[in-house]
Regions:
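Nucleic-acid enzyme cleavage-core boundary/entry regions
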Residues: 1-209, 214-228, 232, 244, ...
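Extended C-terminal subregions enriched in glycine
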Residues: 238-244
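Active-site donor-binding loop signature of nucleotide-sugar glycosyltransferases
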Residues: 265
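Pol beta-like nucleotidyltransferase catalytic core
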Residues: 234-236
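C-terminal, helix-dominated tail/subdomain
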Residues: 253-256
Length: 302
């Protein structure tokens, strides 16, 4: 019989199973289904699950909210929306949520917590998109009236006139839609800011600054470039020749440009960089990780 105030263990397990099944139903088709399936199996085997804390409803609320996010949000805005407290997510749940997000197909080994959250749409730093090249995009904003009916205004902005580059912030990025990259034969993402700045404007090339792992907003914008491209386009990535550069190349190829090829990231370029005095000795642990890393087309850099 149940003692007063103490829940019967069997009933508690059944309650937990039902709770997790409901959470799983909210994230159908996502990697979290597998995470919740594991918890259910543990509960069905009679395990007393302590990690995660089954009574911490807010943790599960945060987890599902991240996966179901429709647009990028600042971390404090997300925290206020989900927990009614702008600082609580960072204080109580950031580390716990990140620990689960490493299961996501968007995860690349070595990502920082900020990068993991950013690729899922939780932002902790200013987000801008930078490029050089003949990109025409449509921007929605404001209202106009046609026959007394209000509709959202649309503007077409031709950035081919910005010979030294174009920069748009996160609000603009959210409302911008690429319309044309007429004449472009190559799209090149460049990880190093100095290298990006040195590139001269070319009518046949679109240079994109790659600050790291692209966020959801940026990935949507970049994928649309492929939809409006005319003819056969070549895709290249010029990144740092280290573990981070390899991971960013893999991420961009897997999640944005399937035909992406490395640019100036071969053995010859690596040797030239060493001769110029670039590079630092690798710690033994990092060296071991690099040797185990599946570098794909960049295998020779290992």
């Amino acid at each position: 019989c149940e003692k007063e105030g103490i829940e019967d263990p069997r009933k508690q397990q059944l309650r937990y199973i039902k709770q997790i099944e409901q959470l799983r139903a909210e994230v159908q088709g996502s990697f979290l289904e597998g995470y919740y399936d594991e918890i259910i199996r543990r509960l069905e085997l009679g395990e007393i699950v302590k990690s995660p804390d089954m009574e911490d409803v807010d943790f599960f609320r945060c987890l599902n909210a991240v996966v179901n996010l429709k647009k990028s949000l600042w971390m404090r805005v997300f925290s206020a929306a989900v927990l009614n407290d702008s600082k609580r997510f960072k204080k109580d749940y950031e580390k716990k949520v990140v620990k689960v997000l490493v299961r996501s197909p968007l995860y690349e080994e070595g990502m920082t917590d900020d990068e993991i959250l950013s690729v899922h749409g939780i932002l902790s730093y200013a987000q801008v998109m930078e490029w050089k090249g003949p990109l025409l995009y449509k921007l929605k904003g404001g209202q106009e009236y046609i026959e007394d009916k209000a509709r959202e205004k649309e503007y077409e902005i031709d950035t081919s006139q910005n010979q030294y580059g174009t920069v748009i912030n996160s609000q603009t990025l959210e409302r911008a839609f690429p319309v044309s990259i007429k004449g472009v034969q190559r799209i090149v993402t460049i990880e190093n800011k100095a290298n990006y700045e040195e590139m001269k404007y070319r009518e046949d090339t679109l240079y994109l600054f790659c600050h790291g792992f692209y966020s959801p907003k940026e990935r949507i914008f970049l994928k649309r470039l492929m939809e409006v491209a005319e003819g056969e386009i070549q895709y290249f990535h010029w990144g740092d020749m280290d573990m981070g550069g390899i991971r960013i190349f893999r991420f961009n190829k897997k999640n944005i440009f399937p035909k992406l090829k490395p640019y100036k990231m071969d053995r010859e370029a690596f040797q030239e960089a060493l001769e110029r005095g670039a590079g630092i000795p690798l710690e033994e642990k990092k060296k071991e990780k690099l040797e185990k890393l599946n570098a794909g087309e960049l295998e020779e850099l290992k």
